[in-house]
C-alpha cells in the first residue's frame, strides 16, 4: 500500500534588504532538526520539514508551522518573519520507505511512486530506470542522460 504523508513548509518573504542579506544563498540541511532550506531568488526563502501520517488531510496546523518560523528566527535573526506563507502537501510513501518502481499486475501499467520526501531527488533516476525496463521489453534501448541526442552530436 502507498500512504499519504503530509509535509509542511513555509516560504518567507524577504521584503527588505536586511532580510535578503541575512537569508542563506545556498540550500541547507539541519541534521538535528531535519529541516531543509532553499533560497528562491532574491526575495523568497523556503524552509521545509516534518512529516505527519494523518490520512488525506491538507489542513495546515499552526503547531507544525510555528517551529519552522521559530527555527528561522533562531538561525537567521536578521530575517523578518512577519510575512510567511505556510503550505502543506501530501507525498506518496511506502511503509518500507522504498519507492514502488516497476510493472503492475495489468499489462502496460507501470509504477514510479512512493518516494516520500525524496520524490524530487529520486523520481528522475527511477523514471529513467523504468523507461529502460519498458523499452527493453519492447526490444529497444534507452539512452543514458549523458548520451547526446543525434541532433546535439551533429552540432
Q: Can you describe what each PLM-predicted range is?
A:
Residues 1-107:
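Active-site substrate-recognition segment that forms the wall
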Residues 14, 98-155:
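C-terminal lid/capping helical subdomain adjacent to the catalytic/cofactor pocket in oxidative enzymes
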Amino acid at each position: 500500500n502507498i500512504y499519504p504523508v503530509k509535509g509542511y513548509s513555509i516560504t518567507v518573504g524577504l521584503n527588505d534588504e536586511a532580510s535578503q542579506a541575512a537569508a542563506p544563498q545556498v540550500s541547507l540541511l539541519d541534521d538535528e532538526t531535519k529541516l531543509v532550506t532553499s533560497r528562491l531568488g532574491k526575495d523568497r526563502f523556503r524552509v521545509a520539514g516534518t512529516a505527519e501520517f494523518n490520512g488525506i488531510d491538507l489542513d495546515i496546523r499552526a503547531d507544525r508551522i510555528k517551529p519552522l518560523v521559530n527555527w528561522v528566527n533562531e538561525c537567521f535573526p536578521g530575517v523578518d518573519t512577519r510575512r510567511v506563507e505556510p503550505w502543506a502537501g501530501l507525498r506518496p510513501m511506502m511503509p518500507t520507505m522504498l519507492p514502488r518502481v516497476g510493472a503492475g499486475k495489468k499489462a502496460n501499467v507501470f509504477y514510479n511512486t512512493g518516494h516520500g520526501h525524496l520524490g524530487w531527488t529520486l523520481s528522475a533516476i527511477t523514471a529513467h530506470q523504468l523507461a529502460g525496463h519498458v523499452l527493453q521489453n519492447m526490444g529497444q534501448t534507452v539512452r543514458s542522460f549523458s548520451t547526446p541526442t543525434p541532433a546535439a552530436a551533429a552540432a
